[in-house]
Amino acid sequence: MARTTPLERVRNIGIAAHIDAGKTTTTERILFYSGVVHKIGEVHEGTTVTDWMEQERERGITITAAAISTSWRDHQINIIDTPGHVDFTIEVERSMRVLDGVIAVFCSVGGVQPQSETVWRQADRYSVPRIVFVNKMDRTGANFYKVHDQIRDRLRANAVPIQLPIGAEDQFKGIVDLVRMRAKIYKDDLGKEIEDTEIPAEMTELAQEYRTKLIEAVAETDDALMEKYFEGEELTEEEIRAALRKGTIAGTIVPMLCGSAFKNKGVQLLLDAVVDYLPAPIDIPAIKGRLPDGTEVERAADDDQPLAALAFKIMSDPYGRLTFVRVYSGVLKKGSYVLNATKGKKERISRLIVLKADERIEVDELRAGDLGAALGLKETFTGDTLCDESSPVILESLYIPEPVISVAVEPKTKQDMEKLSKALQALSEEDPTFRVSVDPETNQTVIAGMGELHLEILVDRMQREYKVEANIGQPQVAYRETIRKPVRAEGKFIRQSGGKGQYGHVVIEVEPAEPGTGFEFVSKIVGGVVPKEYIPPAEQGMKEACESGILAGYPVIDLKVTLVDGSYHEVDSSEMAFKIAGSIAIKEAVMKANPVLLEPMMKVEVEVPEEFLGTVMGDLIARRGQIEGQTVENGIAKVTAKVPLERMFGYATDIRSNTQGRGIFSMEFSHYEEVPRNVAEAIIAKNKGNA
């Protein structure tokens, strides 16, 4: 089957922003103007297309990255609407991994918010080109120029306005197009009747000033244009657009647009900018992967190359288990067998679908550059690579942050117990930052996630979708343990008691690894002193032992283990014996290697009226917080701090009472840090007391 849309006319884009910047409304308007939906949905009415979960429609926030296809000017645009709440960082992270470009939506009143910085950093991590849409220009306090300065100062981005607003707040009535040097005046409520006219006289000077800045920015992308500019020649519209596209894709320019999605202003011009400036799959560097022997390879966006696709999301659905994939090269066909190279398992694609709003359309194939969902995959999870069996490759997976908060879940009846295990399995398949474990001491089921809202929504889904009745415990901090010095240790497991004995023996070197590494294992066994079939069980034994540390029973992370020596017995050695030997060795090593307790530190941003600044800072310091910065602007003080999560429970209530209900704060996970000795001793004593 031939490709219906040429690859250069495909755009895979995300819409990302701070919560409440108007992201979902912007997506709805894009779908309305491009003809996918015929009635505009409103977030505050709970009728939007991309917010499909009940919790999303009730709370007016987008939780899961919904993927939708539409078209504009003969281009196919695949859109992922990402959540703006910090507890759903994984949704933003996984969508950034499979996108080619991003529309970053900012509120013209709020400007650059803490979550905007997080989303921007995630886009930086994957080098995703972006354009900025300054939304809500009709709101009281709207200021396009303030947002422009904040993006340049706080995000260190080369934001270049290609539009200016005509009027603001309730006087916002149109847009100056700096590329064409024309004005667009909106004549009706639906924003479909637009008058193309001269720039208003009172704005010509300002428009000229920003036009010059635009020309200077694009001239820097190309020596020939720079020469033309210095010689005083006018650049043509085509030259400006081509240079803007080149700069945007290279990440050296971020075009800025403005509008009011809710009032239907500026959305068609935003769609034009997506087509004009954001990259097609062939405009971005080829995806990198590894062959089974570790060699690095590239796969270009080309239907004729071998298949390489990344699973970026799992969703349970009336249809069955949907695995969302991005095809980077080759063609994924319905009914075909593919290799999950990450797991080394063969899988069958029973059906393929693409989403158009909340309609699912079955297709026979997905080609290079396409986004869609596959049914029938049983072993494939987020971050896994699907490829041709004859040409295996493993693509770089996603960055999955450690959960920071946990609660115990107790089913109310035996029937609930069965429903709970089914619900937890499905939810953890969908969301890799949601972890489930069973406490070996208490036999309690413990769920962990990225924040209180994250767990609240997951518990809500268990109750609604899976009809589980359960008691939920108090939130607990997800502490971790690690080591501080390199050591050598050995583990021997020998049993002789008549008949076949047991024999396993390993020698390991253990050293601290980079934060975020988790557990890293390397074998340097030579000459078969430990047969290769016994190395994976030994590694497994070590991994399992690290799930419960020696200080307080928390998982041990960020260590590198090298298997350097060992011995075996022709008759008595077995996989189980080496698994136990591995476990003994790692426990001895951790005990000798200066183990320490780690706690999650949160990046906290607080905004309060200036008169409460002293109270709020004193309170943060009392919570073991480290103040990192403070600013005061228009009577509003902003404080940035790093604070242990353990001291942030109930902060929402405290800040309200400390500021007469006028303070707001946001919090996201920053990193794990060593717990001060006096605090650590209390935690360890408490855990040993419970054991």
Swiss-Prot record:
Its main location: cytoplasm. Pfam families: EFG_C, EFG_III, EFG_IV, GTP_EFTU, GTP_EFTU_D2. Keywords: Cytoplasm, Elongation factor, GTP-binding, Nucleotide-binding, Protein biosynthesis. GO terms for cellular component: cytoplasm. GO terms for biological process: ribosome disassembly. InterPro entries: EFG_II, EFG_III, EFG_III/V, EFG_IV, EFG_V, EFG_V-like, EFTu-like_2, G_TR_CS. GTP binds at residues 17-24, 81-85, 135-138. Catalyzes the GTP-dependent ribosomal translocation step during translation elongation. During this step, the ribosome changes from the pre-translocational (PRE) to the post-translocational (POST) state as the newly formed A-site-bound peptidyl-tRNA and P-site-bound deacylated tRNA move to the P and E sites, respectively. Catalyzes the coordinated movement of the two tRNA molecules, the mRNA and conformational changes in the ribosome. PANTHER family: RIBOSOME-RELEASING FACTOR 2, MITOCHONDRIAL, TRANSLATION ELONGATION FACTOR G-RELATED. This is Elongation factor G. It comes from Thermosynechococcus vestitus (strain NIES-2133 / IAM M-273 / BP-1).
